[in-house]
């Protein structure tokens, strides 16, 4: 078996492999918008995060339609979402709730480019890396405020450190 993914967190490293016809991996929790399971004709809001833990945080905050890209910020979006395009067509707005680090900001830009005008972007407090940190630091009401205050933003307005490297 070939290692297809690796996740590092405080104090441990998790490796996994996959021998499956679903390579690349589907987005985590994508079945939440499966047309066979959803009674609504249109899903008003789907939230996309960078990690599974963030999806669980959003579910806890009352947002059932939340998914995570399958391989974090390094995900190949076209391969990951291609099979689910018919499912994604039933989604009106896509809230992108990315991490605040450089890979997370880059992922936000890529997701915005990929999904286009229906994207809304969140803004996290400066001392939080992701929405799970917001829950731990500020509580569930602030998580809800962040999601409810998501706004459209042009991808040209999203700047990463790499794009400003020459000016530093």
Question: What are these regions, as identified by a protein language model?
Answer:
Residues 1-92:
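Phosphate-handling DNA/RNA-contact segment within nucleic-acid enzymes
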Residues 53, 73-76, 98-108:
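Acidic, metal-coordinating catalytic cores used for nucleic-acid/nucleotide bond scission
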Residues 58, 96, 168:
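Conserved RecA-like P-loop NTPase ATPase core
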Residues 81-89, 129-144:
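Short, surface-exposed amphipathic charged segments that create phosphate/polyanion-binding patches used
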Residues 106-116:
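Short, aromatic/basic amphipathic alpha-helical patches
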Residues 119-128:
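A generic structural motif
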Residues 151-160:
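Interdomain "pre-motor" coupling segment immediately N-terminal to P-loop NTPase/helicase cores
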Residues 159-168:
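The Walker A/P-loop phosphate-binding site
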